[in-house]
Amino acid sequence: MSSDNQWSADEDEGQLSRLIRKSRDSPFVPIGIAGFVTVVSCGLYKLKYRRDQKMSIHLIHMRVAAQGFVVGAVTLGVLYSMYKDYIRPRFFSESKK
């Protein structure tokens, strides 16, 4: 086998190096997770100042906002990977001819 192969056994790789490798492969997943944590943190902080709003309504709004951020990040990741795999090679291969 060649030495430049990307595969490595799970025992050889630590959690931090695995997280870094996966973040390089799909960078929008950590962005989605960070956005989710941010929205939930802000929602829990604002829970104290919700005035006369019901708790269930506040939690539903927080959940919808967090899901929206994650779905948006996943959608941007899919669009970026489609661009990288299909659109960019088509333009750069035509410019060389």
From Swiss-Prot:
Protein name as it appears in the record: HIG1 domain family member 1C
What membrane topology was assigned to this protein in its record? Answer: Multi-pass membrane protein
Chief localization: membrane
Alphabetically list the UniProt keywords.
Answer: Membrane, Transmembrane, Transmembrane helix
One CC-aspect GO term = mitochondrion
Q: Which cysteines are joined by disulfide bonds?
A: none
Q: Does the keyword Methyltransferase apply?
A: no
Lineage, broadest ranks: Eukaryota, Metazoa, Chordata, Craniata, Vertebrata
Q: Which residues lie on this side of the membrane: Extracellular?
A: 48-58
Q: Does the keyword Transmembrane apply?
A: yes
